[in-house]
Amino acid sequence: MKYINKLEEWLGGALFIAIFGILIAQILSRQVFHSPLIWSEELAKLLFVYVGMLGISVAVRKQEHVFIDFLTNLMPEKIRKFTNTFVQLLVFICIFLFIHFGIRTFNGASFPIDALGGISEKWIFAALPVVAILMMFRFIQAQTLNFKTGKSYLPATFFIISAVILFAILFFAPDWFKVLRISNYIKLGSSSVYVALLVWLIIMFIGVPVGWSLFIATLLYFSMTRWNVVNAATEKLVYSLDSFPLLAVPFYILTGILMNTGGITERIFNFAKALLGHYTGGMGHVNIGASLLFSGMSGSALADAGGLGQLEIKAMRDAGYDDDICGGITAASCIIGPLVPPSIAMIIYGVIANESIAKLFIAGFIPGVLITLALMAMNYRIAKKRGYPRTPKATREQLCSSFKQSFWAILTPLLIIGGIFSGLFSPTESAIVAAAYSVIIGKFVYKELTLKSLFNSCIEAMAITGVVALMIMTVTFFGDMIAREQVAMRVADVFVAVADSPLTVLIMINALLLFLGMFIDALALQFLVLPMLIPIAMQFNIDLIFFGVMTTLNMMVGILTPPMGMALFVVARVGNMSVSTVTKGVLPFLIPVFVTLVLITIFPQIITFVPNLLIP
C-alpha cells in the first residue's frame, strides 16, 4: 500500500520533470541552434493535462482542495458531521461523473494532433477517465480515514458498493441515468440558471470544495435545460488544461519551492537585514524588503508567507518584537508577491482576460513598490511608538558579503523581465527559465539542493498545481453556463443602471471584491468573478491591464481578512502563534494597503503609464 500511495507522486513528478526538460530543450533549440522544436509545446501541454489530473488525485487523497469552512465551523458537532457526510457524498458523485464524461469524450475524440505526428487527441482525453478512476480510489481511502476519525457517518464500504452499482449501470444500462434529467419533469426556462447559481452558493458555503461545487451547479443547469449539449461542454474540462500559458503556473510554484529548498531565501533575508536592519523598525523593514525581493522570484503570496515566514518571525522575535507585529508584518508583506513580476495571479488573469502577460508583469511593479513603501511607513510608526530596538548597522564588509552571497538570487527577477523584453523567451518560458536558474544556483552555487530534494520539489509543485487545475477545469465548464445564459451581460446591465461613470463602477467592484474576499479564497474568487467582471470593465472602457492589477491587489486583501484569510493561517502555523494574534497584528497594516488601493483606483495612470510606454 505504501508504494500504491506514492503512485501519483512518482508518476506526476516524473512527468513534471519531463515537461521541464522538454521546455528547456525548446528554448535552447530556438535560441542556440535556431531550430525550434515544433512538437515541444504540444507534447508539454499534453503531459501537463496528466500532471494536473494527477495533482487533483493527490489533493483528493489529502483532502486539500479549496473549500469554505466558515459556516461549518459555527455548526454543532453532530450537524457538522452530517454536513461533512453530505459533502463527501457530492464529491463522490462528481468523481463518478468525471469518469462517466471522461469515457464519453474519449470515445468521441477523433482529431489528430499534427504537431505530434498525427497521433489521436484521444491521448489527451484519456487523462480524464483514467486518472478519475485513480481519484475514486483515493477518495475511498480518504473516507476510510474520515469514518475512523468520526468526521463522516458513511463508511468506505458504502462508497465501494455504490461505485460498483453505478459502474454496472453505466456499462450495462446507461439509459437508467436519463431519469436524472430534470427537464423531463419540469420546464424552468430562463430561471434554470438562477436555480443553478443558488444551489452552487449553498453547497459551496456548506463546505463542498469550490471546484466540485462549480461542476455540480453546471451539471444541474444542463439537466434542467440542454442535456443534449453536455458532452460537448464537458470537453472543456480537458481543453481548459491544454493551454501553453498555464504552464507558467506550476513552474513559478516550483521556483518558489526551490528557493526555499536551495537555501536561497535565507540569503535574501540576510541581505535585506544588512541593508535595512539598522533603521527604526529595522527588522520589520527587513521583513517587508525580503518579501519584495522574494516576490520577484516566486510570484506567490502564500509561498512568501510559508517560505520566508518562519525565518522572518524568528528574527523579529529575537530582536524583541511582539508576536502580533511579527505575524502582522509577515502576513501583510506577502501580498507584494502577486503584484511584482513574476506573478501567478497576473498569469491567471492574463489567460482569463486574454491580455498580454508581459504588460501585466510590468504594470504590477509600481503598485508593488508603493505597497512596500506604505507598509514600511506603517511599520516605522508602530516601531517608534512601541520603542522597538534597532539592530547594529552592518559594516561595509558585512553589506558586501551579504550582497555577494545573495547576488545570484537577486538576479532572478532581472533575468525574467530582461529575457521577456529582449525576446529571448516568452512569459510562459520565463517560468521555466526561473525554475532552471533556481536549480543551477541551488545545486552548483549554494550547493544545498540535491537531486532527491529536486524531485520532491517537483512532486510538491505538482500537488499544488492539482488544486489550481481543478479550479481551472470546472470554472471553464461553469463559464459555459454563464456564457449561454449571458449572466455577465445581465450583471453588466445592473452596473450600467446604477453607475454613471467608470470610477463609480470601480468603487462598486472594489466593494464587492472586498466583501467576497472575506469568505472566498483569493484563487477561487479570481476564477469565479473575473469572467463576469471583465465584460463590465470593457463596457465602461476601463483599461484591462489596469483592471487586472487593481483586482489582483483587491483580492490579495482577502487573504488578510478573516474568516477565510489564508495568509493568517499560514503565518500562524509557521510562527507557532494563534490566528487571533496574527489578525490583531495585521489590522493596522490594512490601512496602507487600502490607501494604495484607493490611490490606484482614482489614478489608474500609476499602473498604465510604464507598460504603455514600454509596450505600445
Swiss-Prot record:
Residues 191-616 are annotated as: TRAP transporter large permease. Keywords: Cell inner membrane, Cell membrane, Membrane, Sugar transport, Transmembrane, Transmembrane helix, Transport. Residues 1-190 are annotated as: TRAP transporter small permease. It comes from the Bacteria. It is a multi-pass membrane protein. One of its GO terms (cellular component) is plasma membrane. GO terms for molecular function: transmembrane transporter activity. The chain crosses the membrane at residues 9-29, 36-56, 83-103, 117-137, 153-173, 196-216, 244-264, 288-308, 332-352, 357-377, 407-427, 431-451, 459-479, 505-525, 527-547, 552-572, 587-607. It is found in: Cell inner membrane. NCBIfam families: dctM. The complex comprises the extracytoplasmic solute receptor protein SiaP, and the fused transmembrane protein SiaT. Part of the tripartite ATP-independent periplasmic (TRAP) transport system SiaPT involved in the uptake of sialic acid (N-acetyl-beta-neuraminate). N-Acetylneuraminate can then be incorporated into the lipopolysaccharides as a terminal non-reducing sugar, protecting the bacterium from complement-mediated killing by normal human serum. Is essential for lipopolysaccharide (LPS) sialylation and serum resistance. In the N-terminal section; belongs to the TRAP transporter small permease family. In the C-terminal section; belongs to the TRAP transporter large permease family. This is Sialic acid TRAP transporter permease protein SiaT. The gene is siaT.
